[in-house]
């Protein structure tokens, strides 16, 4: 069946996401995937450098000491922290935890996730550096 009426197509500007703060933050959060790809490629490069022996590893360490690579890695770290923060804030919304017939607020869950993250990071750093 066809109609003679012209369908209404709402115009969408290319900068639609810049209108509201929520959308800008959403795009920033989704943009954290780009530094994550960088870090994944960097890890793969490190594994292959480690596989190729001491000379390859020295080259990889030299690459990591490049100021541009250091800057990109700092940006990647900040993006990972932002992504982690937003996921930890979403976690309590996904699970209803009831204690003594009352729904638990999100704060204890978020704090527990951060504590686990900090403890795991401390253990990994201790094992790696000692």
From Swiss-Prot:
Keywords: Cell inner membrane, Cell membrane, Membrane, Transmembrane, Transmembrane helix. One of its GO terms (cellular component) is plasma membrane. The keyword Cytoplasm does not apply. InterPro entries: Fumarate_red_C (IPR003510), SQR/QFR_C/D (IPR034804). It is found in: Cell inner membrane. Coiled coil: none annotated. CDD domains: QFR_TypeD_subunitC. Its main location: membrane. Belongs to the FrdC family. Part of an enzyme complex containing four subunits: a flavoprotein (FrdA), an iron-sulfur protein (FrdB), and two hydrophobic anchor proteins (FrdC and FrdD). Two distinct, membrane-bound, FAD-containing enzymes are responsible for the catalysis of fumarate and succinate interconversion; fumarate reductase is used in anaerobic growth, and succinate dehydrogenase is used in aerobic growth. Anchors the catalytic components of the fumarate reductase complex to the cell inner membrane, binds quinones. HAMAP family: Fumarate_red_C. This is Fumarate reductase subunit C.
């Amino acid at each position: 069946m066809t109609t003679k009426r012209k369908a209404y197509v709402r115009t969408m500007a290319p900068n639609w996401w810049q209108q509201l703060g929520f959308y800008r933050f959403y795009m920033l959060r989704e943009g954290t995937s780009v530094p994550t790809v960088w870090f994944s490629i960097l890890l793969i490069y490190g594994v292959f450098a480690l596989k190729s022996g001491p000379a390859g590893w020295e080259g990889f360490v030299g690459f990591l000491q490049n100021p541009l690579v250091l800057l990109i890695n700092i940006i990647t770290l900040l993006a990972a922290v932002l992504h982690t923060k937003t996921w930890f804030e979403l976690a309590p919304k996904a699970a209803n935890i009831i204690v003594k017939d009352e729904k638990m607020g999100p704060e204890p869950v978020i704090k527990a996730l951060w504590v686990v993250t900090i403890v795991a990071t401390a253990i990994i750093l201790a094992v790696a550096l000692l």
